[in-house]
UniProtKB/Swiss-Prot annotation:
This is Large ribosomal subunit protein bL27. One of its GO terms (biological process) is translation. GO terms for molecular function: structural constituent of ribosome. PROSITE patterns: RIBOSOMAL_L27 (PS00831). It comes from the Bacteria. The keyword Ribonucleoprotein applies. One of its GO terms (cellular component) is cytosolic large ribosomal subunit. It comes from Solibacter usitatus (strain Ellin6076). HAMAP family: Ribosomal_bL27 (MF_00539). Pfam families: Ribosomal_L27 (PF01016).
Length: 85
């Protein structure tokens, strides 16, 4: 058995925090304006009507309304907000 720790062992033992990405609000839910809908890296889901696009690719509601996800085939997946009256 070794009586010393070894060269690499004391340099190990770190881990980064989770980034907490993903869909935060699902289809059919009512959201207030300004709330985050999706946190993502890249444009996995694209912004549609009444949805804003943050500099870190976060999608957020511009107006109060109901969330709707649509898959438009080759064009990709989109999220829309159907504004409530």
């Amino acid at each position: 058995m070794a009586h010393k720790k070894g060269l690499g062992s004391s340099k190990n033992g770190r881990d980064s925090n989770a980034q907490r990405l993903g869909v935060k609000v699902f289809g059919g839910q009512l959201v207030p304006g300004g709330s985050i809908i999706v946190r993502q890296r890249g444009t996995k889901i694209k912004p549609g009507n009444n949805v804003g696009w943050g500099k870190d690719d976060t999608l957020f509601a511009k107006v109060t309304g109901v969330v709707e996800f649509r898959d438009r085939g080759r064009m990709g997946k989109f999220v829309n907000i159907n504004a409530s009256v």
